[in-house]
Amino acid sequence: MSSITIEELKQLPENSYQIIDIRDEIEISHGAVKGAVACKPEEILSNPDVDKAKKLVICCSRGINSKEVAENLTEEGLDAVSLERGYIAWLMDVMKNSQDEDFAKNVEISLR
């Protein structure tokens, strides 16, 4: 598997993977995946914050640049996948879940 969807990621045990955000500093300053390690692609192997014993989920803006990075890391012997649709997919999922929570709260309030 060279890529993973948000839904597939949610099925993994939380401590079994680490998200690596390869976007640049400007993109990350506008928002980032909670708990992700920000790292330039060329520094992943040498970054002490990267837990190479875990599945590495590589995240870029749209899931395009992360594919090549994940493939290169796999060739180096690491368990690495690209996050399909990247940060945008993560953000859309967060927004959807927030809307669901808001909807549930509104229903609960309306039933009182």
Model-derived segments and their meaning:
Residues 59:
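Short, surface-exposed ligand- or partner-binding patches at beta-edge/loop junctions that are enriched
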Residues 1-18, 25-55, 64-112:
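Rhodanese-like catalytic fold shared by cysteine-dependent sulfurtransferases
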